[in-house]
A protein has these predicted regions:
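Glycine-rich phosphate/adenosyl-contacting loop at the front of the ribokinase-like
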Residues: 1-77, 87
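A glycine-rich helix N-cap at a beta->alpha junction
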Residues: 92-109
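Alpha-helix C-terminal capping segments
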Residues: 64-73, 117-119, 285-288
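Conserved phosphate-binding/catalytic region of the ribokinase-like
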Residues: 2-6, 11, 25-33, 48, ...
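Hydrophobic beta-strand scaffold residues
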Residues: 74, 100, 182-183, 240
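Conserved beta-alpha-beta core of the PfkB/ribokinase-like small-molecule kinase fold
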Residues: 151-230, 247-249
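A short, aliphatic-rich alpha-helical micro-motif
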Residues: 145-147, 203-204, 234
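Conserved phosphate-binding/catalytic loop of the ribokinase/pfkB sugar-kinase fold
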Residues: 101, 105, 116-162
Length: 314
């Protein structure tokens, strides 16, 4: 599986903490959302919590880590600072054998970090300081970085900063030139709301593979139920992967619908990495030319494993 998939995304250190619903209400946080914050707010929140765990994160990076767990050979490009969190991030990816083509700068902006609040229902709510990760730009990536891969996987979160949005478009241009498939995750429903028109244009004009959960897909398609969204998406010659939590997953391929049941678990501890690890299982099988049902099954297995622990890594 050497040099088959390249992930590009925000290099974010995850800081995990357990809280109750009152904490979210007190801090005006919407459960299940990702809120972008500045460094002073990050530091203020961090000082008010008891940290459970710190590990390298970021949506696409989590997916690449999952592929490495399955003995694949993924690569990842992200931007870090040469600070404490940057060192943690670099060491973490190198340890699990993700080929990390990092852009390291010693500047005023710190390495990105996200406080992940886990409530008793296992839902995750994130406050993310993008830091230097959001400065990943066209100048940091060239054709040599992408040449030879089968798939480039990008996250919707990159559109939250203009610099990374331009880089996203540049990577698409390089991918098309080199006959590389472009895959994208929708990241979260609020990200889709912020960039819906742009994401829809990407789907129509540029993407080969789109991954999102049921709510994200419905928001993208402006539909109230999944069946209506699926009927619209069947019109496009794309691979669409839709996760539905305990209701399983759906794939749209060649105008056909494939359903897959979820893997039952005894106890859910943290939903943080469910979608990211589902994508890892899907891509591992897809790159091995497995049938679409097996791609979904392996995705479901990895998602089930990761939600039984704190954190987004296996």
């Amino acid at each position: 599986m050497s040099k088959k998939i390249l992930g590009i995304g925000n290099a974010i250190v995850d800081v995990f903490v357990k809280v109750d619903d009152n904490f979210l209400l007190k801090n005006n946080l919407i459960k299940g959302s990702m809120k972008l914050i500045e460094k002073d707010e990050f530091d203020s929140l961090k000082s008010a919590i008891k940290i459970e765990k710190i590990e390298a994160g970021g949506s696409v990076a989590n997916t690449m880590a999952g592929i490495a767990y399955l003995e694949g050979f993924p690569s990842f490009i992200g931007k870090i600072n040469s600070d404490e969190f940057g060192k943690i991030y670099k060491k973490s990816l190198e340890k699990i054998k993700v080929n990390f083509s990092y852009v390291e700068k010693n500047e005023d902006l710190s390495t990105g970090a996200s406080i992940i609040f886990i409530t008793p229902d296992s839902e995750r709510t994130m406050c993310t300081y993008l830091g230097i990760s959001s400065q990943l730009s066209m100048a940091d990536i060239n054709e040599d970085h992408v040449r030879g891969y089968e798939i480039i996987f990008l996250e919707g979160y990159l559109w939250d900063k203009g610099i990374s949005e331009e880089m996203f478009k540049y990577v698409i241009k390089l991918a098309k030139k080199n006959n590389i498939k472009i895959a994208m995750s929708l990241s979260d429903i609020f990200c889709v709301t912020r960039h819906r028109k742009d994401f829809f244009k990407l789907l129509i004009n540029d993407l080969n593979i789109l991954i999102g959960n049921e709510n994200e897909i419905n928001e993208l398609m402006q539909k109230n139920n999944l069946l209506d969204s699926i009927n619209e998406l069947k019109k496009f010659d794309k691979i669409i992967i839709i996760t539905r939590s305990e209701s399983g997953s759906v794939a749209i391929l060649n105008n056909e619908i494939t359903n897959c049941e979820s893997v039952k678990v005894e106890k859910v501890l943290d939903l943080t990495g469910a979608g990211d690890l589902f994508a890892a299982g899907f891509f591992k099988e897809y790159l091995n030319n497995s049938d679409i049902k097996k791609c979904l099954k392996t995705g479901s297995k990895l998602a089930a494993q990761v939600i039984q622990k704190i954190g987004a890594r296996l």
